[in-house]
A protein has these predicted regions:
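Membrane-embedded alpha-helical bundles of multi-pass transporters/translocases
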Residues: 2-264
Length: 264
């Protein structure tokens, strides 16, 4: 239903179309489907990445990472690494609101959220490969330096993954002002996220054993097999994050603009 406006009110309105959401041009059906597909694909890799970063990284640490280290020392290092991961996860509870505020206050010509898909996807992927290589073999050279650098790398990795995750779910209101369309994006992201998270569980053993056999001649899991797993997951992470970054479009709204102005 259209509402007539006086010429004076029309001149004062920042949106000539009279849409309170601030969206002037509606996307075509093809554009909508493309953006939905791009957004949905994003959480496929994001959830797979998270499973590799949490569940399977611990498996890698406890089974392969310290295989060339003296057994007694390896046991201590495993306990130390797993404890550090738990501490970092707890700290993340308090850090996430700050990261969310940083994302929401980002202002670029590409939008608030898409830049973090690009940056977060790239940085977290590179660092995931690093931790799945034992920091490029440093674990077998100097365990003290390995622990120090591991803490730094894992914290940065976790931060940039969180930036990607926060921006992914936070961008839904910026993609569409329509409540039904938002629910579609949420449902698609949840659905593909389930596929990605559980899918990595299906492929992890074949990937690790196949690449272990290629490089060692044995089907037993090895460093090379887990490194290959890390690289494949990282590539999937970059591909899906960049698909969101380049395949979606943020729409600035009048309400958000007013909120920004009131916050200044």
């Amino acid at each position: 239903m259209s509402v007539s406006q006086s010429p004076e009110s029309e001149s004062q309105s920042p949106n000539p179309a009279g849409d309170e959401s601030g969206q002037i041009n509606r996307p075509t059906k093809a554009e909508t489907l493309r953006r939905r597909a791009a957004y949905a694909f994003g959480n496929l890799g994001q959830s797979a990445f998270y499973n590799a970063l949490s569940t399977y990284f611990v498996v890698y640490v406890t089974s392969v990472l310290f295989v060339n280290v003296e057994k007694a020392l390896a046991t201590k290092l495993i306990a130390l690494i797993t404890s550090l991961i738990v501490i970092i996860r707890i700290a993340e509870i308090f850090l996430d609101p700050l990261l969310g505020n940083l994302v929401d206050n980002t202002n670029t010509r590409f939008g608030r959220f898409r830049p973090w898909q690009f940056i977060g996807g790239l940085v977290s992927a590179v660092l995931l490969v690093m931790v799945y290589t034992g920091l490029f073999g440093l674990v077998n050279v100097n365990q003290t330096w390995f622990i120090v650098l591991f803490v730094v790398v894992f914290i940065v990795l976790d931060v940039f993954y969180s930036m990607r995750d926060i921006s992914y779910w936070g961008m839904i209101p910026a993609i569409s002002s329509d409540s039904h369309e938002r629910s579609v994006y949420t449902a698609l992201g949840t659905f593909t996220g389930s596929i990605g998270y559980n899918g990595i569980t299906i492929v992890v053993v074949p990937i690790v054993t196949t690449f272990s056999f290629m490089f060692t001649g044995s089907r037993a899991e090895s460093q090379s097999g887990w490194t290959a797993f890390g690289i494949i997951t990282a590539l999937l992470g970059i591909l899906t994050a960049w698909t969101v970054a380049f395949g979606t479009k943020e729409n600035e709204s009048v309400l958000r603009s007013r909120a920004d102005q009131s916050g200044k």
